[in-house]
Amino acid sequence: MIKKIIFTVTPIFSIPPRGAAAVETWIYQVAKRLSIPNAIACIKNAGYPEYNKINDNCDIHYIGFSKVYKRLFQKWTRLDPLPYSQRILNIRDKVTTQEDSVIVIHNSMKLYRQIRERNPNAKLVMHMHNAFEPELPDNDAKIIVPSQFLKAFYEERLPAAAVSIVPNGFCAETYKRNPQDNLRQQLNIAEDATVLLYAGRISPDKGILLLLQAFKQLRTLRSNIKLVVVGDPYASRKGEKAEYQKKVLDAAKEIGTDCIMAGGQSPDQMHNFYHIADLVIVPSQVEEAFCMVAVEAMAAGKAVLASKKGGISEFVLDGITGYHLAEPMSSDSIINDINRALADKERHQIAEKAKSLVFSKYSWENVAQRFEEQMKNWFDK
């Protein structure tokens, strides 16, 4: 029987994250809702304490590295006598025992391998949020994924592994709150304007440039229509992504005032942006493991027009809980799909059906319950 769960993740963002960090958000939102006692072990970034008690069942232990340690052991000599992986194990041994605990490692097979090397008998779970070619020391590893798409991906590559689905989630309380009333006014959007919304990274795999190209044509065919883009167009300073971001900014500038670049927004602000949308568009160019933008838009009661690649199509069902973008995707096909969705007399009913679906399956409360059931299924025997 498991008496304590240790959650951990790569040493990049502290928990709870102060910005958009999906994996760290998942850990925090689920851990604090569990009835099984648990501890989070994560990196200590500037402004975070040594320790944070969240509630009676959840606390956070922060792992800090001094500047001298980093310079001497991680940069100059690369000896690293007390690495991040060992510090995670030390936290486990401080709060529980190897026999009574399981360590859930999020989205880093490298960290899984490092912990396994240092503790061959530890109970480990690998929680993958993306499709990476597996490099695990345990052929029969226990793996959690958010979608059927990702489950099939890992089962094909690790046939002896136990792969189970626990989805990503959203904060139901946030999406029950009344949204900000004056956001349209702040963005200089008329109340009767049709608003298309894109939210996500400004990167080639998300398809935003193709959407901008389609919108440039669409605005000549439809009057009083706006495209709002939520995402940081300066996230990358150099390389291909930076070049892509410049192309996106140039395309938006060419469109003019009908395209509103709203920049990056905090997770707490996103429900206000979904509220102003008539249609939320997810033009992904790659297979998505899940898609939080689609789930959040559905939770806000908004119609979603999305790529059917990967895990998105498991909950965005064409004509039932949303609409699919036709393949192969092009400017013309996107225009046709936008017009089709906006013209559908059942659009609001479809959006309401989608809202009911995500509230019943993807709230953090439901996700935490599914995770807890899976842990008991694997370890309480």
UniProtKB/Swiss-Prot annotation:
Organism, scientific name: Salmonella typhimurium (strain LT2 / SGSC1412 / ATCC 700720)
EC number annotated for this UniProt entry: 2.4.1.56
Coiled coil: none
Main location: membrane
Family: Belongs to the glycosyltransferase group 1 family. Glycosyltransferase 4 subfamily.
Protein's UniProt name: Lipopolysaccharide 1,2-N-acetylglucosaminetransferase
Topology term for the membrane: Peripheral membrane protein
Lineage: Bacteria, Pseudomonadati, Pseudomonadota, Gammaproteobacteria, Enterobacterales
Pathway: Bacterial outer membrane biogenesis; LPS core biosynthesis
Function, in words: Transferase involved in the biosynthesis of the core oligosaccharide region of lipopolysaccharide (LPS). Catalyzes the addition of the terminal N-acetyl-D-glucosamine (GlcNAc) group to the outer-core glucose II, the last step of the lipid A-core oligosaccharide biosynthesis.
GO molecular function list: lipopolysaccharide N-acetylglucosaminyltransferase activity
